[in-house]
Amino acid sequence: MSTEDLNMSAATKNVLAKVRRIIPPMLESFHKGQLGRVAVIGGSENYTGAPYFSAMASARLGCDMSHVICTPAAATVIKSYSPNLMVHPLMRQSPAPNPNQDPATRDTSKDPDSDPEHISAQIIDLLPRLHVLVVGPGLGRDPLMHATVARVIRAARNRGTPVVLDADALILVQKDPGLVRGYDGAVLTPNVVEFAKLCEALKVDVSEGASETARVEALAKTLEGVTVIQKGAKDYISNGETTLTVDLQGGRKRSGGQGDTLTGSIATFLGWRKAYLDRLWDVGQNALGEHELVGLAAFGGAAITRECSRLAFAKKGRSLQASDLTEEVHVAFLNIFGEEDEETDSSRL
C-alpha cells in the first residue's frame, strides 16, 4: 500500500519522511542489541496483558531485545504468552495487611520485598543493558509499586535513558511533577481523562475553548520540555516548542489496551534514535538534531498505532481487541515506511 492510499496530509507525509530517516537499514554489520533494547515496567497480579502488548509491539516493530519487568505473579502468565520476551519478576506489590499488627510498627528492613529501595536497586542494575524504559502498562496503583518505579525513573533520568510513561504511571507525575519536569527524554501518553487530570493537578492555565494544540502545548510547557502525546480522534504531540498533529485514519473501536501498542512502538523508535545518534550507519548530510528526535519518535509510534488500529478494525470490526493490533504491527510498518529494497517505489517514504 502506498502513502497516497493512506490519505495522508502533506504535513503528515513530510514529518513521516523525517521519521523514516531514524529507521536503521538492515545491515549485516549490526549485532544483537544495537537496534534497541527496551524494557516495560508494569504487570501486576491483576494486569498481565498490558505489559505484554507493549513489549510485543516493540519487538514486532523491530527492536532487538524486549524485556518485561513485573511481579512474580504476573511473570508466569506473561512468560506463557510468548517465549520471545525476557521476563524479570523483580517488582513487588504491598504485602497483605496483617490484622493483628499495627501497620505503623511494621519493620520493612527485615522484609526486603517490602522495601522500595531494595526492589528498585535490582531494576536499576539492569539500566546499563537498556536503551529505553516504558513505565505504566499494568502497573496498577499499589503504593509499593509506585514507590519502586519512582526510584527507577529518577535513576533512568540520571543516566539519560528515555522513559515513556502511560496509564497509572501518570499518577506519579500528578503527585510529583518534578519526577520528569525538565527532562526532554520523558514522553507522556495520556488519554483524554488522564490528560485532564494532569492539567488539573499541575494547574495548567488553559483558557476555555482553547484548541487541542494549545492545551497540549500548555501542559508540555508546564513540564518544561517533556514530550506529551494527547491521544484522541487525532493525536497531538508537543514538547512546548514544537507541536505535531497525527491525523492518519485509525479504527473506530476503542477497546482497552490499544495504548500499549503506542508505548511499545514509541519505545522502539526511541531505541532507533540512539542508534541514529551513535551513527551506526551513514545518516547522510544535514542530520536530524537530537532535540527533534524525541518528537519524531513519538510521531512514528502514533502513526504505527493508528495504522494498526485501522487494519485490525477492517478485519474485526466491533469485535476488535488489543491483541489484534499486535498482529498488524509489521504490516503497518510496511504500509507507512516500506523497506529498503522497496525504496525505488516512489510511493514509499
Swiss-Prot record:
Residue positions binding (6S)-NADPHX: 138, 191-197, 260
Region (Disordered): 89-117
Any Pfam family hit: Carb_kinase
Coarse class of the protein's main subcellular location: cytoplasm
Biased composition annotated in UniProt, kind: Basic and acidic residues: 104-117
EC code(s) of this entry: 4.2.1.93
Family named by the database record: Belongs to the NnrD/CARKD family.
Entry cofactors: Mg(2+)
Enzyme class (EC, first level): lyase
Places the protein is found: Cytoplasm
Keyword Nucleotide-binding: yes
Regions crossing the membrane: none
Gene Ontology annotations for the cellular component aspect, listed alphabetically: cytoplasm
Lineage of origin: Eukaryota, Fungi, Dikarya, Ascomycota, Pezizomycotina
Protein name according to UniProt: ATP-dependent (S)-NAD(P)H-hydrate dehydratase
Organism (species): Fusarium vanettenii (strain ATCC MYA-4622 / CBS 123669 / FGSC 9596 / NRRL 45880 / 77-13-4)
